[in-house]
Structures are given as structure tokens and as C-alpha cells.
Regions:
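Conserved, mostly hydrophobic/aromatic
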Residues: 131
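Basic/polar, cationic surfaces and motifs that engage anionic cell-wall
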Residues: 15-24, 122-128, 136-205
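N-terminal catalytic cores of peptidoglycan-degrading enzymes
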Residues: 7-122
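Intrinsically disordered, low-complexity N-terminal regions enriched in serine/proline/glycine
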Residues: 4, 78-79, 159, 187
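N-terminal amphipathic/basic-hydrophobic helices that include classical n-h-c signal peptides
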Residues: 1-14, 203-205
């Protein structure tokens, strides 16, 4: 017979697993040097959703990987000259085809949010996991990206005491615009289990 709803959810969860080292079993791991230890005793309580493409609005290349591993060639594209010396990373990068690349263990602090504040608490990198979707503010994301993001989110929420999900623009308003107007928050929220975290607004003054 048909699986009950809860069993279907459980089977989805089994697709992805994060081990004690903070690594996702379905991701390709490419270590970024742009990370460090979280402050002692910090609980992971926030997911931050971003978009990124390098060069801007171009997909499938190695630009994002090069950026997160400090191998960007400033001569490769005019835009890259503005990235010289930038040291950034995210925990996860979800490509257009749904492939996941992990750059930093979830146990460690990735450098994705920059100057940021969530509900009165500064330094979001300390207590968050950063997920970059390959995309831009002017390009709709793919069906596969939503499916993978939803499954990854549920996996992370099972593993860590995550209480909130926010966009980069929510934690750095006025400075950042991603994941942008093309990201369908309603689709993302509705894909999560009904008892899952709902995105709340940033109450920071």
C-alpha cells in the first residue's frame, strides 16, 4: 500500500545525512580555507539563504568554487577585479542541477554573512549555517534547487537546534539583496513539513 505521509517524510530525510564531523554525505567536499572555529558553546540556531553566480548571471563555471578557495583570477573577468583579496565562504553551494558542494564543516564558522544582525544578535556567522544557491536576483531558481534545498533544510534542522531561516538581505538589510525577488519563499516554506520552522521577520531595529 501507500506509505503514510510521515513515512514518506522519513524516507526523504534518509536521502541526506550529516555526520559527527559536520559533513553531508551527498555533497562533494571542497575545503575552503575561509573558516574558523565557532565561539565555544555556540548553538547553531539560524539558516541563512544566499544566491551567488560568478561571473554575475553566468552559471555552471568554476567561479564560485575559485572564490571560496581563494583561487579567483582577477584577469579572468572584469568583475573579478573587485573580488581581489576577498575571503569568503559558505557551508553549502547548491548548483542549478541540484549538485551540492560543501566548503566548510557545519561544526565550523563559514564566512558568509559578513556584518550582520538577526533579532538583535550580531555576527550571524557565529551561530548560522550559510547556503548559497547558484543564481541571481533576476533569474528564477530551478525546481531541482528547491527540492534539494528543502531536503537539505530538513536534514540540517534534524541535526541542529535551528530556530530561524532568513535571507542574507534579512540579516544585512540595505547591504545585501539576496536571495532576491526571484526566490519563492512561499514555495520553500510550503515544501517543509507543516511543523517546521516558519521564516519570521527580523525584529532588529
Amino acid at each position: 500500500g501507500k506509505l503514510p505521509y510521515t513515512d514518506i517524510q522519513l524516507s526523504l530525510h534518509s536521502i541526506m545525512h550529516i555526520d559527527a564531523a559536520g559533513l553531508l554525505d551527498t555533497a562533494q567536499f571542497i575545503a575552503s580555507p575561509n573558516c574558523d572555529e565557532r565561539p565555544t558553546g555556540t548553538e547553531i540556531s539560524l539558516l541563512v539563504i544566499h544566491n551567488i553566480s560568478l561571473p554575475p548571471n553566468e552559471f555552471s563555471g568554476q567561479g564560485v568554487i575559485d572564490l571560496f578557495t581563494n583561487r579567483i583570477d582577477p584577469q579572468a573577468h572584469p568583475y573579478y577585479q573587485s573580488l581581489q583579496g576577498l575571503k569568503v565562504s559558505a557551508h553549502f553551494f547548491v548548483r542549478r542541477d541540484g549538485t551540492i558542494i560543501q566548503f566548510v564543516s557545519c561544526n565550523d564558522r563559514a564566512w558568509h554573512a559578513g556584518v550582520s544582525n538577526w533579532q538583535g544578535k550580531d555576527r550571524c556567522n557565529d551561530y548560522s549555517i550559510g547556503i548559497e544557491l547558484e543564481g541571481s536576483d533576476i533569474t528564477p531558481f530551478t525546481d531541482t534547487q528547491y527540492e534539494v534545498l528543502i531536503t537539505l533544510t530538513q536534514c540540517l534542522c534534524n541535526q541542529y537546534p535551528i530556530q530561524h531561516i532568513a535571507g542574507h538581505s534579512d540579516v544585512a538589510p540595505g547591504r545585501k539583496t539576496d536571495p532576491g525577488p526571484c526566490f519563492d519563499w512561499e514555495r520553500y516554506d510550503s515544501g517543509l513539513r507543516r511543523d517546521f520552522i516558519k521564516r519570521s521577520t527580523n525584529s532588529t531595529p
